[in-house]
């Protein structure tokens, strides 16, 4: 699901925008970027990183200009990914992303007084590493996103495709391929 999320780094007087790409099934954050502008570049960079970790069958996002522009949609088409977009103003079409944003805000952003963009980038990066590797989820049977992401069996796929993935600016939907060449150790070290 693609939706912009505004983060106010106290002390800078400006807004920062966060995009994240997550696996719906495991809630694993595959990639994320922070920007002080709403241009598409930071969203495309996050998508490029996520695509290096696997190719989804379907990518679902909202209709924000970052996600409807040629740079973003062209990259998806280039990789043979089908594009799906939610209805305008339909935040409930991607509850997993909305839940991620709530969690990030209440467990990280609102508790910190970022002095600048660098502080926000470091804090959010640390939080996503914690979120993936250490934060259990009730919906995942009290396992972490990393535990579930790594344990997705090939038998659970159809045609080599895992059942789900998502991305959003604060996240956009993304389905990934379970490729044998996928190096889980390199994903967890990011």
Where are the predicted features?
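Charged DNA-binding/catalytic regions of mobile-element recombinases
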Residues: 1-190
